[in-house]
């Protein structure tokens, strides 16, 4: 499998008020920008405020970057991203099949200033209205999902 990104599914069908865009990209740093670009496209459609888009991009960047950096330890793999629009919220789910970790283990930098890169989970928790993380050491795969309520229904 080469380095190409695969758009797995793009639907605009109204299934109980939900619209979903799915993207599957190689677990490499240069593909984080593609995940951000897909989010920017959705933001244009929804006419989201710039400040909200900036927060969403930061949370997304941290989630995808964590999978790229940690899940596969430099080896080959993929990261799947789903953007789900429901009512007045955007849910973003990032899934990998790499090495799991203990989500309860505190960050070594906890308590320091939040900046992009290094405190990803803390940053996402701060930005999101809802947050879920499923991963375990010694078990393959991690699933991170965050929800941000939008100011207007989608």
Task: Identify the meaning behind each predicted range.
Residues 37-61, 113-114:
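Conserved short strand/loop->alpha-helix "switch" segment adjacent to the catalytic nucleotide/phosphoryl-transfer site
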Residues 36-39, 96-98:
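Short, small-residue-rich loop/turn micro-motifs
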């Amino acid at each position: 499998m080469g380095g190409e990104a695969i758009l797995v599914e793009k639907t605009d069908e109204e299934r109980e008020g939900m619209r979903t865009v799915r993207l599957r990209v190689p677990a490499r740093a240069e593909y984080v920008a593609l995940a951000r670009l897909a989010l920017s496209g959705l933001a244009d459609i929804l006419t989201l405020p710039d400040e909200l888009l900036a927060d969403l991009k930061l949370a997304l960047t941290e989630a995808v970057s964590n999978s790229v950096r940690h899940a596969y330890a430099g080896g080959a793999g993929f990261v799947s991203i789903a953007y789900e629009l429901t009512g007045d919220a955007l849910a973003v789910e990032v899934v990998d099949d790499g090495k799991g970790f203990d989500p309860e283990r505190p960050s070594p930098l906890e308590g320091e200033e939040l900046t992009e890169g290094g405190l990803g989970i803390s940053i996402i928790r701060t930005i999101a209205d809802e947050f879920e993380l499923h991963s375990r050491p010694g078990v393959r795969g991690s699933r991170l999902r965050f929800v941000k309520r939008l100011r207007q229904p989608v």
